[in-house]
């Protein structure tokens, strides 16, 4: 079988001819006949995956002719299908000793794929341990062996065909054969077809593509002069021969075989090689004479053999000589050296096939030692792995089977470039395509000839035969015949290629046409192809995926073609596949017709618009009236509720409210008269000073009927309160909008006014001995009536004085604790503090009659009215714009419409954070459910268009929300009581407002609705502002469910139950889980869309889950902190890490343990379990596997390797440290699909559960995300991104140094210059980090690295540092973010050292090698590749 080719095609998907063969295998039993290196393994993998995903529970048995090939194919299957339960069954497992059915049942239990040699399966079936009915699929690698008495044919003859004849096709497995040589004659081909009950098949519709990947080598003859007959027959008739033939003991047999091998090596390679063989064999025997596992002879035989050979003379050879004459070799080997030295390929890689195992070892050693070849060729040897533990013929067997895998690996990775091997390497073994293949001995048959030739599959390669000049002619004629066959085959292929090219120039007229009536747009077959390619170019880009239409063809009996096109897997399955209807002479015409029908289907399913163009952001997704919105809007002035109240005073209906004032344990109260019922007002906490707070509670309003006299008295009382707290006389008008007074019966109000209005001279108050609790505010007339708080009287030197404290400033907002005044300390603490205590002459002062304990009401009135105004604005908003939302708690609305500029107790920033996620979630779900045909690209573009600030700004303006946004700042010093006379004649005006504020308030209201009444109320609020949003019916089945999904009992996914158990959710629609695990590169299942749509939905669901977790936390965080926390929890780094961590053990296949002493006791042992991960279940392209396995031999490092290295440090940081491990995450640089699959599974659970967020929360809790999130919240982990912190630190430092210039993070990509490519990318630190780095997309190879430079030119202008301070440079990073984080960490450390005064000009020196400043005095423990100033 052709191994997986080393060359990587530019197309990272299954080739068309491979898909043609795969689809043919689904229709019936076939034998795939394709050349070596054409990729038959891919076909087998596709067939195995299909069988597993449509499994009936039967075994898949893969038969390979040799042990190395079995091991190789099992490795390939395990790497490409990690979730499969598979194992090998080989002779080394001692299967011949498994003599009980219970042993076989235990071994095979739970397995899905078995790889073995044919003999193992034949023996098991012969003894009845494995029945043919238990097999679902039989794969025959190197199917041409299925003839005569070969075990493969015995399986078919003795078990398959009898069962087929007796029970029918349902009782036997499906057959897939793979071969590069189906036979040398038509009769042989028919025999193999009959034996395997299959039809030999080779690509027909895509033969031209197959020819592009298979290269016929040039056949060359290497002639040599044979040995003279007298030298060749030295052994015959010798004394040694007679002696050995006379005895017939086991030792004589060993010696006879040994001598025959030595003579063969002498004849083939020469005397030096024979002497080396004898010497090395004797040394090998003596060194392992008493090791049981190496030589299995009894004691006497061993002693006898050792005694003979230890006394025999051993040839002395010189292996270090530089003179070729010291290496006498045979003429045949001389011809080989001459041929090898004539090759001039600098990338030489070659194979030499020899006949005997012993000759392999000796020739390899001779080539690596001979002066002519040892410096040019790096030689290895390979004899296979069939060394049995019971082998007793060990004398002269020099090569250990344990060395074989190393030889092949060395050859694959270029550490060796020439391999000497037996025929074991001619079939299937995965080796690099060779430039030279040499048959040192003539192949024994046509199949061997073809198989050896298949190793020379590099372009312009050579296939050489070693032929004797004295050959009788028959052998040469035979190979000349074969050479002619090869030449004719090449010519036939060339003729076929020329015919196809000639047909390609034929211009067939494809007369298909489609017209869109609404626009007149026309689609024709002539331009359909470029339309289709353009559509594919607009699909979302993904690494490991090439988004382009894939065409395949079928050919009818008349040789005409019909095309089929398959679009990338991100396209809906309904339109992903299209076929032509007519038959054509040329592929060009067939492709045009298929492209026409494909594009027409895209239009019919709404994937292109009426202009027959892909939907774009500028047309379908965005309203035209939002693109022209300026950044600053002219909007309505803030709604003034006092205007409405001024008009309501004309009515006789009044309402009385009661305000309860609590201070410590003392309660007082006030009356509050309004012209209408007031909305509920939340209790207020007013901060008088650092130790004194008042709590105001409002009782419900009740209607009251007041006389004109009482209204006037309430106005007087209101004026009294307001005047009591200001030194400025009030205006004459007292028609206040709201009236305040003492909580007294109405008939006592006039008495209260008379008692408390006005003031008295301080001297008079002193004379009347007014009680201290009735003492009013002191006014210093010498200082314009400055207000003071009376403390005590002082009568010193006959002058009456007052000791007072300053009255709290009117500038202070009592709602804000940060502006608290300090309470007056104890008297013994202020004796030396004249700024606090005031001593005034009584003659300059007056004292108000209103007690100071009641004057505080005058300070409360502005605060009460300010909060009442906010409540009235919110109430009016709820009665108009939000009339359908029905908020329960008005405080949420007040918070949502209050700008930070207003400096109110709350503002919209926190609610905007919640609303943003709720909006994104709702719109994403709506788009997902209501547009089942749209791919992820359309969904993402539409989501961004609907939730962008411009759209929300337009929604706010359309609904008139601008008038209800509270921007007026409450300033107590400038505040004046609203008057009826002023408000009656107020005129409308406008104000300027940022468009972003309007958008933020919309999101804040959505957040307020979410907090007030949950998700349903929030979504009602969304529809109010964005009526185009159709709320999704999440309880209904997804509209795009495939017919497969109706069969819920069928296990469509490999090991699905195991996966569902660990996810913690059992899917009702199994295809949803398949879709969630289908990578966009998956080519073989056109009925399932890739996971991108579900990942789009899951991303929004995850945001919603984390936001709900943050909201429910007992500690309230500010908006900026919540944003950083959410980013730390849902970022792709953490999700990818948790995906890699999400592992569990799958029990390995059981293995019987045999007691080799008795060979009777069998114990079933369980090997270490196989580890499965979430990513093990990904369905992807076998032709370009995702990097899910560590291959250290390749010299490269993938994300899993880096994860294994950094995992302990990351876990320690996540569980113990106070800082988030941004640097460690960026160093892993995980591929995006690791995080994508987590989000796609969340999306799949959400859809399958009918929108149950709890089910999704259960999965992320199992994943470990909830635990990490709770620790971040509970322990206040610092989640600030290093680049943000570095920018802040640099800006602070620049400000302190008086520098105006900012700092810039400059990032560029650097390719290895040997690749001939170079890219440069400069990125500002504030740039958005996308899912993929721009330079990574389409990049190949590990040579792409990033360098980040942070210019410190601004600092160099400062005299404290001078010009010796150089820029910070970080090199060799795998991603842009990693480079910037590494540089940012150095900036943070550098700034700290600069500010501490430890780093100065005298400490700096220039690194000559790098040209970059380094700190000679600091131990900074930098990573390799990092230099710093």
Swiss-Prot record:
Binding of ATP: at which residues?
34-41
Q: Where is each Helicase ATP-binding domain found?
A: 21-200
The GO molecular function terms of this record are: ATP binding; helicase activity; metal ion binding; ribonuclease III activity; RNA binding
What GO cellular component is one of the record's annotations? cytoplasm
Q: Which residues form the RNase III domain?
A: 874-1014, 1056-1250
Cite the entry's keywords alphabetically: Antiviral defense, Antiviral protein, ATP-binding, Helicase, Hydrolase, Magnesium, Manganese, Metal-binding, Nucleotide-binding, Repeat, RNA-binding
- Where in this chain does the record put each Helicase C-terminal domain? 335-501
Family named by the database record: Belongs to the helicase family. Dicer subfamily.
What the protein does comes down to:
Dicer-like endonuclease involved in cleaving double-stranded RNA in the RNA interference (RNAi) pathway. Produces 21 to 25 bp dsRNAs (siRNAs) which target the selective destruction of homologous RNAs leading to sequence-specific suppression of gene expression, called post-transcriptional gene silencing (PTGS). Part of a broad host defense response against viral infection and transposons.
PANTHER family for the chain: ANTIVIRAL INNATE IMMUNE RESPONSE RECEPTOR RIG-I, HELICASE WITH DEATH DOMAIN-RELATED
What this protein is called in its record is: Dicer-like protein 2
């Amino acid at each position: 079988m052709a191994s997986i080719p080393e060359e990587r095609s530019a197309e990272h998907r299954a080739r068309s001819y491979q898909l043609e063969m795969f689809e043919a295998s689904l229709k019936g039993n076939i034998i795939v006949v394709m050349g070596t290196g054409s990729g038959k393994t891919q076909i087998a993998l596709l067939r195995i995956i299909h069988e597993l995903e449509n499994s009936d529970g039967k075994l898949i048995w893969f038969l390979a002719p040799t042990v190395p090939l079995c091991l190789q194919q099992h490795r390939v299957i395990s790497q490409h299908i990690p979730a499969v339960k598979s194992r090998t069954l080989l002779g080394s497992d001692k299967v011949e000793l498994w003599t009980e059915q219970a042993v076989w049942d235990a071994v095979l239990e739970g397995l899905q794929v078995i790889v073995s040699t044919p003999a193992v399966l034949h023996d098991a079936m012969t003894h009845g341990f494995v029945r043919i009915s238990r097999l679902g699929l039989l794969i025959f690698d190197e199917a041409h062996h299925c003839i005569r008495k070969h075990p493969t044919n015995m399986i078919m003859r003795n078990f398959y065909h009898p069962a087929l004849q007796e029970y029918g096709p349902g009782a036997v497995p499906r057959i897939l054969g793979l071969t590069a040589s189906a036979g040398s004659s038509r009769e042989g081909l028919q025999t193999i077809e009959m034996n395997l009950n299959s039809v030999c098949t080779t690509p027909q519709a895509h033969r031209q593509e197959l020819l592009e990947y298979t290269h016929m080598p040039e056949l060359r003859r290497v002639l040599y002069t044979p040995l003279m007959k007298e030298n060749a027959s030295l052994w015959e008739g010798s004394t040694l021969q007679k002696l050995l033939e006379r005895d017939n003991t086991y030792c004589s047999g060993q010696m006879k075989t040994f001598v025959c091998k030595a003579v063969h090596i002498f004849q083939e390679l020469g005397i030096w090689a024979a002497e080396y063989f004898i010497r090395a064999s004797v040394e090998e025997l003596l060194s392992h004479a008493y090791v049981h596992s190496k030589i299995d002879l009894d004691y006497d035989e061993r002693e006898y053999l050792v005694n003979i050979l230890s006394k025999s003379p051993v040839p002395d050879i010189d292996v270090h000589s530089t003179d070729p004459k010291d290496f006498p070799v045979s003429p045949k080997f001389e011809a080989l050296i001459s041929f090898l030295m004539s090759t001039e390929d600098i990338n030489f890689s070659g194979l030499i096939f020899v006949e005997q195992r012993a000759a392999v070892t000796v020739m390899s050693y001779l080539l690596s030692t001979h002066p002519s070849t040892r410096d040019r060729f790096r030689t290895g040897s390979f004899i296979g792995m069939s060394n049995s533990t019971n082998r007793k013929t060990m004398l002269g067997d020099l090569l250990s089977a344990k060395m074989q895998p190393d030889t092949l690996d060395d050859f694959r990775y270029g550490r060796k470039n020439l391999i000497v091997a037996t025929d074991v390497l001619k079939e299937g073994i995965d080796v690099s395509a060779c430039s030279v293949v040499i048959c040192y001995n003539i192949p024994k048959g046509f199949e061997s000839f073809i198989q050896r030739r298949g190793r020379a599959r590099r372009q312009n390669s050579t296939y050489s035969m070693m032929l004797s000049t004295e050959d009788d002619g028959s052998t040469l004629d035979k190979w000349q015949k074969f050479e002619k066959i090869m030449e004719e085959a090449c010519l036939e292929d060339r003729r076929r290629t020329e015919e196809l090219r000639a047909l390609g120039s034929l211009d067939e007229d494809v007369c298909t046409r489609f017209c869109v009536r609404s626009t007149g747009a026309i689609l024709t077959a002539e331009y359909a192809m470029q339309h289709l390619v353009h559509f594919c170019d607009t699909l979302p880009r993904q690494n490991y995926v090439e988004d382009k239409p894939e065409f395949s063809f079928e050919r009818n009996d008349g040789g005409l073609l019909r095309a089929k096109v398959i679009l990338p897997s991100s396209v809906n399955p309904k339109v992903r596949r299209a076929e032509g209807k007519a038959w054509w002479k040329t592929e060009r015409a067939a492709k045009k017709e298929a492209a026409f029908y494909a594009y027409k289907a895209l239009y019919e399913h709404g994937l292109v618009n009426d202009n027959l163009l892909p939907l774009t952001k500028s047309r379908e997704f965005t309203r035209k009236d939002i693109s022209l919105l300026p950044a600053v809007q002219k909007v309505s002035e803030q709604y003034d509720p006092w205007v409405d109240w001024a008009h309501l005073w004309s009515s006789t209906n009044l309402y009385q409210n009661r305000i309860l004032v609590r201070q410590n344990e003392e309660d007082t109260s006030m009356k509050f008269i309004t012209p209408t019922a007031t909305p509920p007002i939340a209790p207020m906490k007013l901060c008088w000073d650092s130790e004194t707070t008042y709590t105001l509670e409002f009782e419900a309003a009740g209607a009251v009927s007041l006389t004109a006299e009482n209204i006037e008295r309430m106005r007087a009382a209101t004026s009294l309160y307001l005047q009591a707290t200001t030194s400025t006389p009030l205006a004459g008008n007292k028609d206040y909008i709201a009236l305040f007074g003492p909580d007294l019966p109405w008939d006592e109000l006039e008495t209260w006014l008379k008692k408390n209005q006005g003031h008295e001279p301080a001297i008079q108050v002193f004379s009347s001995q007014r009680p201290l609790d009735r003492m009013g505010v002191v006014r210093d007339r010498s200082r314009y009536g400055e207000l003071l708080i009376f403390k005590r009287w002082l009568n010193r030197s006959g002058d009456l004085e007052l000791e007072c404290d300053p009255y709290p400033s009117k500038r202070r907002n009592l709602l804000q604790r940060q502006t608290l005044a300090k309470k007056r300390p104890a008297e013994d603490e202020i004796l030396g503090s004249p700024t606090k205590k005031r001593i005034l002459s009584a003659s300059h002062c007056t004292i108000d009659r209103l007690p100071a304990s009641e004057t505080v009401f005058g300070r409360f009135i502005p605060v009460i009215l300010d909060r009442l105004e906010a409540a009235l604005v919110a109430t009016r908003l709820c009665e108009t714009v939000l009339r359908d939302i029905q908020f329960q708690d008005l405080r949420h609305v007040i918070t949502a419409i209050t700008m930070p500029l207003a400096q109110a107790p709350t503002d919209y920033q926190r609610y905007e954070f919640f609303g943003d996620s709720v909006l994104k979630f709702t719109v994403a779900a709506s788009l997902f459910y209501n547009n089942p045909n749209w791919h992820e690209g359309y969904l993402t573009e539409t989501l961004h268009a609907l939730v962008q600030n411009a759209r929300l700004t337009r929604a706010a303006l359309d609904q008139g929300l601008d008038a209800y946004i509270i921007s007026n700042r409450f300033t107590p010093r400038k505040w004046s009581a609203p008057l009826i006379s002023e408000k009656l004649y107020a005129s409308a005006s406008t104000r300027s407002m940022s468009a972003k504020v309007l958008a933020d308030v919309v999101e804040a209201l959505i957040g307020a609705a979410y907090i007030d009444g949950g998700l349903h109320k929030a979504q009602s609020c969304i529809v109010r502002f964005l009526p185009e949003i159709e709320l999704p019916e999440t309880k209904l089945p997804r509209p795009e469910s495939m017919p497969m999904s109706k069969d819920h009992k069928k296990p469509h996914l490999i090991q699905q139950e195991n996966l569902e158990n660990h996810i913690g959710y059992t899917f009702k629609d199994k295809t949803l889980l398949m879709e969630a695990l289908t990578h966009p590169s998956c080519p073989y299942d056109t009925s399932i869309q890739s996971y991108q749509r579900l990942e789009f939905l899951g991303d929004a669901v995850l945001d919603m889950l984390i936001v709900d977790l943050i909201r429910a936390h007992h500690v309230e965080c500010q908006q900026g902190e919540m944003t950083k926390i959410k980013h730390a929890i849902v970022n792709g780094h953490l999700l990818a890490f948790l995906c890699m961590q999400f592992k569990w053990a799958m029990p390995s296949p059981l293995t019987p343990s045999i007691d080799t002493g008795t060979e009777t006791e069998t114990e079933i042992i369980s090997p270490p379990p196989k580890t499965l991960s979430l990513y093990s279940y990904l369905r992807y392209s076998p032709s370009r596997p995702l990097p899910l396995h560590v291959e250290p031999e390749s010299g490269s490092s993938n994300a899993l390797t880096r994860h294994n290295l950094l995992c302990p440090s990351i876990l320690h940081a996540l569980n113990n440290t106070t800082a988030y491990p941004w640097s460690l995450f960026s160093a892993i640089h995980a591929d995006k699909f690791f995080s994508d699959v987590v989000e796609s599974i969340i999306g799949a659970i959400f859809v399958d559960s009918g929108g149950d967020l709890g089910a999704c929360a259960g999965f992320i809790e199992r994943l470990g995300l909830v635990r990490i999130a709770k620790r971040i919240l509970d322990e206040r982990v610092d989640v600030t991104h290093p680049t943000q912190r570095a920018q802040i630190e640099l800006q602070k430092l620049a400000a302190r140094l008086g520098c105006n210039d900012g700092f810039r993070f400059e990032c560029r990509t650097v390719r290895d210059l040997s690749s001939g490519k170079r890219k440069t990318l400069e990125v500002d630190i504030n740039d958005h980090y996308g899912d993929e780095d721009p330079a990574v997309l389409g990049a190949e190879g590990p040579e792409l690295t990033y360098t980040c430079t942070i210019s410190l030119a601004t600092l160099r202008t400062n005299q404290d540092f001078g010009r010796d301070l150089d820029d910070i440079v970080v090199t060799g990073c795998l991603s842009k973010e990693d480079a910037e984080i590494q540089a940012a960490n150095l900036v943070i450390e550098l700034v700290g050292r600069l500010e501490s005064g430890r780093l100065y000009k005298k400490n700096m020196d220039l690194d000559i090698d790098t040209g970059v400043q380094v700190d000679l005095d600091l131990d900074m423990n930098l990573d390799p590749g990092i230099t710093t100033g």
